[in-house]
Amino acid sequence: MKNKLPPFIEIYRALIATPSISATEEALDQSNADLITLLADWFKDLGFNVEVQPVPGTRNKFNMLASCGQGAGGLLLAGHTDTVPFDDGRWTRDPFTLTEHDGKLYGLGTADMKGFFAFILDALRDVDVTKLKKPLYILATADEETSMAGARYFAETTALRPDCAIIGEPTSLQPVRAHKGHISNAIRIQGQSGHSSDPARGVNAIELMHDAIGHILQLRDNLKERYHYEAFTVPYPTLNLGHIHGGDASNRICACCELHMDIRPLPGMTLNELNGLLNDALAPVSERWPGRLTVDELHPPIPGYECPPNHQLVEVVEKLLGAKTEVVNYCTEAPFIQTLCPTLVLGPGSINQAHQPDEYLETRFIKPTRELITQVIHHFCWH
């Protein structure tokens, strides 16, 4: 029953008080089961059918899909339930206690992005879901901050094909229709150790990596020259060499060298295409030194994403907000949800608060966010 739903600020407070940190380091990683249970119970109280889905390959993580209404199409509102870890020494407040001060709501996940679910639930108080003409879906995912395993698994397994979707990441209520992807690789070269007094008796991995880096930098130049998307502030794919390590002593021939690099592809560039370009760039080294060079993923890759600028979702949201859609450089779950339906990224709070100590959401976003959610539900589920 709707009268069982707590007030908006109490929903917000309960979400922030329920830890759901995701991290690659097992000691820091937490299940989101308690948070999913909270959300599931509230959406059931509002008359939604709720499905909780274990996400394979995770440490006890779950997705939740709440649905109401019949038929095809409809609207999907989506977000992730996890937060990043926090640095206790840099927070001046308890990360798990929602506090309000000077027009700001503080707490871990206030902006990125547990708060979005509080806004959805609050907006639905005044919506008679029994009268929806098209279905409304609410998706809460797991592990966005690490592998995006929840969104990947949902997109791979669901039969849903809504008319459109909105992911409530913090965009300061500026609609986002495209962003770059992210690929992170480790280049490893296995040499042969030996005493530095006789270089011919070994294979110096640092020297081979020097050769490989030259080819990688040529790839970087080629990407900049061949691919352009003028809407981005950096209108080409970027390639960064971020970390390198090799050798253990000045008088030993280096036996192993490892380089970590990333590429941020433009929308429309496929992961297979990028892998092919990287392998082609490194082919001269691999051919000269067979079996000594390997390329491994550091993280699951994220493709670029774009919602067609002339889609009805873009037109409706731009009209409601009086603002044009933007493109951004950070990544979200949109590439995976976009495989199901046209998708925008749009939510309260600033991306500048994401992953920051003393994270907050400004209270000025409360009224317009509630109004926006109500309006998009009316447009896509009642018309």
Curated annotation (Swiss-Prot):
A Pfam family matched in the record: Peptidase_M20
Catalytic reaction list: N(2)-acetyl-L-ornithine + H2O = L-ornithine + acetate
GO BP terms, alphabetized: L-arginine biosynthetic process
Compartment(s) of residence: Cytoplasm
InterPro entries referenced in this protein's UniProt entry, alphabetically: AcOrn-deacetyl (IPR010169), ArgE/DapE_CS (IPR001261), Bact_exopeptidase_dim_dom (IPR036264), Peptidase_M20 (IPR002933), Peptidase_M20_dimer (IPR011650), Peptidase_M20A (IPR050072)
Keywords carried by this UniProt record: Amino-acid biosynthesis, Arginine biosynthesis, Cobalt, Cytoplasm, Hydrolase, Metal-binding, Zinc
The keyword Disulfide bond is annotated on this UniProt entry: no
EC number: 3.5.1.16
Protein name as it appears in the record: Acetylornithine deacetylase
Native species: Escherichia coli (strain SE11)
Lineage: Bacteria, Pseudomonadati, Pseudomonadota, Gammaproteobacteria, Enterobacterales
